[in-house]
Amino acid sequence: QIENSLKVDPIEFQNVEKKNYLRIKTSGQIDFEKQIYLYNLNETGKPGFEVINPIKIGNEDYLINRGWISFDKKNKPEINIIDQKNIIGTLMLQSKSSSFKPKNEIDKNYWFTLDREDILKFTGRNFSKYIIYLNGNYENPRPKVITAKISNNHKKYAITWFSMAISILLIYLYFRKKNY
């Protein structure tokens, strides 16, 4: 179902039932003054920021994830070039904040999670639970490629923990035999 949603042409965003992985086209007013820099790695593992902006569409406030930039591009004017009248993106439900990540440094605009309370403090607004992920051929920021591939690392984790258990058992047997 996710794959099918991502393959269809984007639909006009006005008065549509919002759902995860819905491809949309819309226009809106992007707020560049309250731009959020969310720490993240790009697809090759290089650290940088995802650029996230408040956007007003009709009477509703959303966040739009415009993509990834390297650290040196932070606060540069060239990352704010976008056609606000022709926005194509993918609607996705905002993920829950992780308690394992550091706290956001709102005063420095250095974010690790999109904590809704922190966003309210920073912007003064409440936003939809859906985030728009920009699609298109932009270079800075470079939009995140949304795929139907859902991460499944269970096999890797099982092998890792099984290997550790075997290693500990062998170490235990070695020292036990040595003592007798």
Cite the ranges covered by each PLM segment.
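Surface-exposed, charge/polar-rich loops and edge strands
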Residues: 1-15, 19-180
